[in-house]
């Protein structure tokens, strides 16, 4: 049976599947095992990637499902983002911490002191290059629209996990050397303790949920219908596809049928039957 890591790397378009050779074979399961060792408390989940002045559909939906999974496991998740996602997560009954565009280290340390996270997870959140730029996949600097959420991952003493799909996201600094020769743009330099790579970052988030469910026995992974409704709600609030820049029911150019394929495969990998709902 195909493992979680192989499922979330299906349909690879940007070389992530080739990078799996640089990763532990069980990188998703290993990340889930570590998360389950964290003391129960606040987990900060960073997300929100600026595309044409809007948040993209990749990232926030996956972050919402990881947050729900963590709640099921006894954690207290907090979404950490910027004004790009204002209002989205409150509608999901999730706690949110907003970071200002011009926040400096003192303010960021204050956020960490207030939250006191036992762990931090980034899901499709842009991180700085070694030159200090925030670059999208077209090589355009989006720093004017991107709060320094990545700096929290450098300032914290808590364990960290990054989920990305292109090379410019928080956590991809772990593979900066390998990415440098493969990307047109300069890769993110911000490292995390653990990294999950996927064709789509939402799929990486689903992979984490699947691994958490398999290890804990608790319902963590959404059904295809649940995931589609989550994306629909966020599109209604202004999220756009990262490829087409359109406010549409797609993620990085993949339609909902492909989303369902990935989720059904993950459900099969952990022994869950179709029709069984999540939390």
Q: Language-model segments: what does each one mean?
A:
Residues 93-118:
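A glycine-rich helix N-cap at a beta->alpha junction
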Residues 74-82:
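Short internal beta-strands
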Residues 19-23, 49-61:
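Short, glycine-rich nucleotide/cofactor-binding loops
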Residues 42, 118-119:
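Structural motif
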Residues 56-75:
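Histidine-anchored nucleotide/phosphate-binding helix
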Residues 1-42:
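Positively charged, low-complexity intrinsically disordered leader regions
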Residues 170-279:
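C-terminal functional extensions of proteins
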Residues 59-60, 119-120, 125-218:
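Conserved mixed alpha/beta catalytic, RNA-binding, or beta-rich assembly cores of soluble enzyme
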């Amino acid at each position: 049976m195909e493992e979680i890591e192989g499922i979330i790397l299906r349909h690879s378009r940007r070389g992530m599947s080739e990078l799996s050779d640089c990763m532990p074979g069980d990188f998703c399961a290993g990340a889930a095992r570590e998360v389950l060792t964290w003391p129960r408390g606040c987990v900060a989940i960073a997300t929100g990637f600026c595309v044409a002045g809007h948040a993209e559909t990749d990232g926030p939906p996956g972050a919402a499902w990881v947050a729900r999974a963590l709640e099921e496991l006894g954690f207290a998740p907090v979404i950490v983002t910027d004004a790009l996602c204002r209002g989205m997560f409150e509608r999901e009954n999730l706690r949110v911490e907003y970071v200002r565009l011009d926040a400096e280290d003192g303010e960021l340390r204050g956020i960490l002191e207030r939250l006191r996270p036992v762990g931090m997870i980034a899901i499709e959140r842009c991180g700085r290059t070694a030159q200090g730029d925030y670059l999208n996949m077209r090589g355009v600097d989006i720093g004017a629209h991107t709060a320094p959420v990545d700096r929290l991952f450098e300032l914290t003493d808590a364990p960290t996990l990054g989920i990305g799909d292109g090379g410019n996201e928080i956590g991809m600094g772990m593979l900066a050397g390998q990415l440098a020769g493969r990307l047109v743009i300069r890769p993110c330099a911000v490292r995390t303790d653990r990294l999950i790579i996927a064709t789509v970052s939402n799929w990486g988030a689903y992979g984490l949920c699947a691994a958490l469910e398999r290890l804990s026995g608790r319902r963590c992974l959404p059904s295809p219908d649940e995931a589609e409704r989550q994306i629909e709600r966020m599109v209604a609030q202004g999220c756009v596809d990262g490829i087409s820049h359109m406010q549409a029911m797609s993620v990085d150019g993949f339609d909902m049928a492909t989303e369902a394929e990935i989720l059904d495969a993950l459900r099969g990998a952990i022994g869950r039957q179709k029709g069984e709902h999540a939390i």
